[in-house]
Amino acid sequence: MVAWFKYGSNVAKLAVRRTLSQSCSYVARTRVVPSQYRFLHATVSRPKSQSAPVPRPVPLSRLTDSFLDGTSSVYLEELQRAWEQDPNSVDESWDNFFRNFVGQAATSPGISGQTIQESMRLLLLVRAYQVYGHMKAKLDPLGLEERPIPDDLDPALYGFTESDLDREFFVGVWRISGFLSENRPVQTLRAILKRLEQSYCGNIGYEYMHIADREKCNWLRDKIETPTPTQYTRQRREVILDRLIWSTQFENFLAAKWTAAKRFGLEGCETLIPGMKEMFDRSADLGVESIVIGMSHRGRLNVLGNVVRKPLRQIFSEFSGGTKPVDEVGLYTGTGDVKYHLGTSYDRPTRGGKRIHLSLVANPSHLEAVDPVVVGKTRAKQYYSNDVDRTKNMGVLIHGDGSFAGQGVVYETLHLSALPNYTTGGTIHIVVNNQVAFTTDPRSGRSSQYCTDVAKALSAPIFHVNGDDVEAVVHACELAAEWRQTFHTDVVVDIVCYRRFGHNEIDEPSFTQPTMYKVIRNHTSALQIYQNKLLESGQVTKEDIDKINTKVLSILNEEFLASKVYLPQKKDWLSAYWAGFKSPEQLSRIRHTGVKPEILKNVGKAITTLPQNFKPHRAVKRIFEDRAKMIESGEGIDWAVGESLAFATLLVEGNHVRLSGQDVERGTFSHRHSVIHDQETGERYCPLDHVVMNQNEEMFTVSNRYLLFL
């Protein structure tokens, strides 16, 4: 391979480079170029090509989208040479492929001297944008990041020059999605590059080509490679503007009233709020009825006030040191925690006229500790609401860039997403990526290019978006909701933004990031950027903007005055669903837990009787025979039998029982055997699933999972 790389053709070099790129080795093939738009990078001279041996052909029916990767370029060239000399020398499927390709090219107008190699190289360029286009996207609102742009995005690498820009090329009509499927077999290179730049190198960078699923990739290509960018109506833009003003003015109001208070504000990522609201609106349109939200401290007060609608007067009262009612002090409702750890729940009306229940889970200072809590609560809500398709209850987790890359609980939670009896039908992850973790730069906080690279292990799509472009944030959030409801797997929205102040408002960030904060001090806010955009478009006037600002400030001032006399009258973040929740004092009283002997014998018979045609391991069969004798005689009952009887009687009483752990089905010491296996067919059988008539199969859940700790 080394000799081939040294003396081979341009395409051969490209093939080796792409092979190396699969191990994420970008250093040898990238260079920093100016971030402004350009089609052609510098051309590098290379030695004359030599032939490579013809690889073994693969039937066309077995090809996937990956046949367009770099190594296939050499493959196809050699196959074509062999086919031109003798069509019978290649597989029949390849013979049909070349005949079809040449036939279409010959009948397409405006193509003079066009070759299969040129078209295939053009398709490789298209694929390069789909794979690496995010590395050229304009993601950093501060413009400080020097982004290495891969040579793969340079048309010169594929043999194209500026004189080719207005030439028409045959790109074919392929069984893939995106603009290659639009039945336009002939396009100019300039038009193709413009479309690719527009789709993949704007203010959203899409990472999805690591997903080994044609249907999913095609679905995303159809969403990404649209003929024109997403255009919002005047009414829709007014809604987005209103939500962005609320987000911005809320932080400004807190900063003006409580200058020295810690609030971990959202300044620099105010677009999160309209993004979340639009995501929830879209989710409701797609059938979601309940969303469980987990997040840490950054922007939490803004989410509490603007998304889940905790009364503003209550938030302001907490800033002023307001107290809880006497009857709540010391009870299980939780007291004494800081205001940016508290949760709440709310039935939110959506833009589409629906209502969706939102629940923001209380969160400690331990970053990401809430992740498994949110996923577990979502799974529980799905069970108790009989949401078997997992389309009505959804989890949303909001992370910081440092914690998403650095906390092990994130990876552990991600890997629960597709396990049987743990999946919730997909969680939407939003990363508030302000490009600094407290005082730590990204280069010291992770070894990967993106903080979201950990999610690639799940084949989750990742949408990187410039946090200064509110419409791009809205689009990415809506697309995430559509993905989740379509494919029921995790998806990540990475909002690349900045933190206008320190980690908290009394911290001085210039101690450790002087260059960044010199830029931030003079950087225009996302609200001002959007207002200017709308004014230039003529869709919104200055009077319209002033009217919204006046309305928002008036409400904030009214709520501030009301906060001076505010006294909470209910347990703030416990909704009606928790009305019967018992206190520790009520739960800790001694209760009678015994059951009648005849009940024990009845359930004992159920959990020791196996189907007639079921063939367990002979040792397991002997264990169940011994258990039946124990239950019948009442003598020699061991721990495993006692445990099974306890679970069975809980099921008889209508309780949901769930066991989770790496080896819980069999038991670490081969003692439980709650799930047994037919030695001939491999069929599984769980006796505790058959304790009562017509028992819900999820009423008793026992499920192995990955190793958590030793």
What is each PLM-predicted segment?
Residues 2-443, 447, 453-454, 458-463, ...:
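Conserved internal helical-beta-strand scaffold that buttresses enzyme catalytic cores
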Residues 119, 470-477, 527:
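Amphipathic alpha-helical transducer elements in NTP-driven molecular machines
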Residues 436-438, 472, 500-501:
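Short gly/pro/ser/thr-enriched loop/turn and capping motifs at secondary-structure boundaries
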Residues 464, 472, 477-485, 490, ...:
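C-terminal catalytic or substrate-handling cores of phosphate/nucleotide-
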Residues 497:
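Flexible glycine-/small-residue-rich
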Residues 514:
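A mobile, often basic/glycine-rich helix-loop segment
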